[in-house]
Structures are given as structure tokens and as C-alpha cells.
């Protein structure tokens, strides 16, 4: 057990350190892309003119309250050092791994060597640089926070449902509600956390005859209210007519997205066909894991319900991404930002398959096959992304030069990745006025 634990510790610390080093080598303290949509709010806050409603303002069909709070705190206490915000993304990823370890240890029934080896593989995936876009764009911290809060909520609710008196309310239950709210107000993908939790409560009643009337009534009411607040005046981002008339493309999009959660980029580009092929393989693993779950003895099934719901979460996230992004083309499924939301299914399937291995060579072989695929692609993704560090740093430093030059033109919008020139110009003035981000002397002493 000691050796297996050391392997896990090395994987966790090593993968986390690699992500931190990659950020330090590939990113600069500069505002670009969707971050521009939040800078005027930061200026209002520092000038004492912030309206509370601005925290809840829609942004790209999301209501990122958690992100807004992080940016305001960073501006107040850290001069909006966006590199540090990116480091916080790594902390969220590590926290997700720790949550899974803590809540899933009972599933392995004392087989700690197996548990630590399996979770070492999962760690390599969850901290893989296949998510480079989320590690290197500060506001994409919402992808990591959404998954952290969602996983915590689902597993807390599972522990509540394991109690003999699960019809009552507990600290775990209220913790699950709180984390559901944080996931929801991180980004749009968090809307699936209440959905999965409701399914979890319903399965607990249907499979185990748990008395969950109070639990489901209170949860649905609170989650429904939070969802209503979130969706109010948000605007529709899903073209259902288009999606329903392009079902073949939708299936390709979903398969490519599932595969993309593990495969990563090669020479700074995705290989769509490889994503689809691996997506088919992962889909088969999910089917094996799901079918076996419903055939488990009741005690094992009850212990595994939380992880089974994590499997559903990642699949549902990919389906939601497909509904909202299919009109952009099947290739959009291979965007590295989405991998953070969907890889939780891969981790859940690996855990489930590994716990099925007792007395079953078939599931042992499937677990080894899946684990081997995860390790191979995680290592390749890290290697491929490490080759891009110099180019990405040069790109970020070029953005700094554009902003410091002061004469920002229409032609610069493409480089700064934001369509509204007024946002960029006014935001740049906010940064200058308050000494934020690239204009902070302490974090940019060489400028």
C-alpha cells in the first residue's frame, strides 16, 4: 500500500507541478479574449461604483458569478495578476482529485494499492495539458470550478443518501445544495448538477427503496429556484431546429467530444478522426460500466451510485455542449476547453471498471485497456503542449506590446480575441488607471 500511495502522491504533485510550470513558461500577465467583458466591472468595483446586479450579469449565455468574485478579489488584493488566477485553476483540478479520493475510498473495500494506482492514472488525466486552453486563459477557471463543485455536490449527496435516515436533512445535504449553486453560478454546464442529483435521488428510491420524499422535495424546490434565477433573461443559445435536423452530425460531435476529453492536440491541432475513434471506444467502456452497475448486488450498487452519477455528468455535459455548439461545426467538439467538463466520465468509468475486477478477468482487462489509453494520451498531450510553450509566451507578450502601445485599432481585435473594440479600449484604460495586470509594476518589473 505504501508504494501505491507514493505513486499516487508523485502523480498528483508531479502533474500539478507540471501544469504550474507550463503556465509560467507559456503565459503572460495580460488580458485577452472574453476577459475583456469583465474589466469594466472591475473598474466600477475599484471606483466604488459597482452595482450588485453586475455580479449576476449574463456573459456569453453564462452567469459567471464565481468568476466575477474571483476577478474582483484579485483586483483588490493582487492587482489582477492573471497568472495567479491561472494557478488557481490548477488548485481546483487538484481539489477535484482529492474529493474523489476521499469519497470513493470505500468502493475499493480496503484494496488501497488498487485504489491508489487507479487514482494515479485518473490524476494524470485530470491535470493533463490536453486542457491547455483552460490553463492559459484566466477566465476559463470556470471550467475547473464547475467540475470541482459538481463532483463535490454529487458525492456529498451520495453520502447523505447512504445514511439510514436519508429522508431527513443533513449537513451533507445542505452542502450538496450549496455546491450545486456554486457549480450553477460558475458557468452554464453547472446547470446539469441539479439534474444529475435529482436522478441520483430518484435512483436511490427506485433501486434501494430509500425514503427520500423530504430530500427530493426540498432539493427540487431549491434547485428549481436557483435554476430559474440563473436562466432569467439569459437568452437562448441552443438552436433546437438545427440540432434536430442534423442528428448524424450531432452523433459525430458527441463522439468527437468524448474522445477529445482524453486525446488532446498534436502539433497544436486536433485530429478529429482520432477523437471520434477514441470516443467510440470510450462509449463502449461507458456501456460496459453502466450495464454492470445495474447488475451489481445491492450493497455494492449503493456504494457505487455516486460514481455512476459522475459518469452521467460527463456524458450529459457533452450532450449539452453539442446542443449549443453543433452549428459551429463538428470540428468545434475538439476544442480543448471542453475536455475539462467531459473527462470526469472517463475517470468515473475507470473507477467503476476497476472495482468490478474482483473475480472477473473481462473487467480487469477493460480497466487495464482504459487505463493504458488514458496514460498514453495524457503523456502525449503533455509532451505536445510543452513544445508550444515558447510560441504561446511570444503570443502573450505580443498582446502586452499592443496594449502598452496605446493605439489599439480594429486590426488588433483579432489578436486580442474580442469583437468589441470599445470594451478593449475602455478596459485598457481601467487597467492603466488602477495599475492592474500588465500595468502592475511589481508583477511586471522588466517592462
Which positions does each model-derived feature cover?
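Intrinsically disordered, polar/acidic, low-complexity terminal segments
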Residues: 2-66, 71, 75-119, 170, ...
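Extracytoplasmic catalytic-loop and juxtamembrane helix elements of membrane-embedded
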Residues: 28-48, 137-140, 230-257, 306, ...
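Aromatic- and kink-enriched transmembrane "portal" helix at the membrane-lumen/periplasm boundary
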Residues: 116-148
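Transmembrane alpha-helix segments characteristic
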Residues: 117-126, 220-228, 298-325
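Specific aromatic-rich, kink-prone transmembrane helix
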Residues: 121, 140-165, 345-348
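Hydrophobic/aromatic-rich transmembrane helices and adjacent perimembrane loops
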Residues: 135, 142-145, 331-353
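Membrane-interface alpha helices of multi-pass inner-membrane proteins
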Residues: 170-199
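Hydrophobic transmembrane alpha-helices of multi-pass, membrane-embedded glycosylation machinery
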Residues: 191-208, 224-227, 353, 358
